[in-house]
Every structure is written in C-alpha cells, then in structure tokens.
C-alpha cells in the first residue's frame, strides 16, 4: 500500500524505512542550516525529533530560514518547526526545548537516548560541548561548519574535521578537538573563501535591531553579523539531513 514515504522506500527498502521510523534524532539549532535538516528528516520518515533552540523568528530570517514567514515572526523557532513537522506527518514525535545549548545547560540532555545528533549551532563553546557530550555517550554526531558570508552552494563537502581547510570555524574546531583528544568528527564544510560583508549603517543590526520582544540573544551583542542568503545554508542543512538518513540505515552508495 502506498503512503507518503513510498517514493523514499523505492530507494531504501522497507527495512530501512522501519529503521527510520524507529529512530530519534536531536537537532541543535533550528536556523538557516538546522531548519532544513529538520525538514529533510521529517520528510524522510524519522520517527522522533528533538528540537533545541531558544531563538524567535526575526524579520531578518526571512531571507533564508524555512521556519520564517511573515506570519511566524516573533514565534519560537522550535514551535514553528514542530507545527510544520506535524503538517508533514502528525505521527512524528516532536520534543522541543527552548534552550540555548552551552556547557552550563548541557546536563539537561541525556545523549544516550538519541540515535543521532546534529550540531547546527553557531557558537564554538556550544559546538565543542555538544561534540564532547555526544562522543561520551557514543552517539553519532555531524557538525555544520560556517555557512555565512558565502555564495556558492556547490562548494560543500562532507569529511572529517581534520581534513577541512579554508573555513575559519573549522580551523577553530580542529584546534579545540585536538585539545580534547577527539580523534574523529564528521562535518559539512565549504571550501569557498569567506566574503567580506558590505557594511551599510542603514541596515546595521547593531544600529537598527529588530529582534522580537523577549529575544534572549539580540544581534546588538554579537561581534559581527554575517551576510547570508537562501541557497547556501539551506544546502548545508539538506546535506546534513541526507548524511543522517544514510548513516541511520547503513546506506552503501553504488560504485562507479
């Protein structure tokens, strides 16, 4: 009998679909990258999704984030994502956390309950804490490196953190992983050189902040706000979603 996952089953088979339906994945960061990862996982039939993000949809998110529309501005991203997931498949179990993941909040999560962890957050301290906790729990993790200030979505690669180049965030993560004797870390990164944003005081977030009321981490406190677009972060998020699905089912690509 056909269902909404019939076309995916044609590629993966029934056993793999059952594996996906029985899997639980945590996505940390529901923004330009993580939002599209969630979309891919939900449409692929992952049975349980944990969404972690304390941010609200801002008008400036409309250029790239799948959770952002005029109607959702001011709403929590995890709430918007949960509704979207249930519009896709009401049977997916969704757990939301309005939490900014840091070393101080990390103990609120039991990483042994996840089949896979996705890091799509944008602070080094949070990213490395997330990696350490996942590694300690023996839970597979994939991390997004920098997707801002870039224009070419074809430059993304999936590799180990120690094989990365060009990306400034990856360079910092390599150093932090070495300090903690982390031997391997799967990442998605871009080999495209980082662009320098075209500064314009008339659209400066620091001078004209429009973060929704109640936003905990306003752009006024950020050292810099990277340029972004609709077609680079989204591709990174979809690549990550694909890697998670393939890893969960043990997909072996055809040679040739």
Question: Where are these predicted regions, by residue range?
Answer:
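Glycine-rich phosphate-binding loop and adjoining beta1-alpha1-beta2 segment
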Residues: 46, 51-89
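Conserved N-terminal Rossmann-fold NAD(P)-binding element of oxidoreductases
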Residues: 27-29, 52
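Glycine-rich phosphate/adenylate-binding loop
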Residues: 2, 112-113, 126, 136, ...
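N-terminal charged helix/coil linker that caps or initiates catalytic domains
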Residues: 1-26
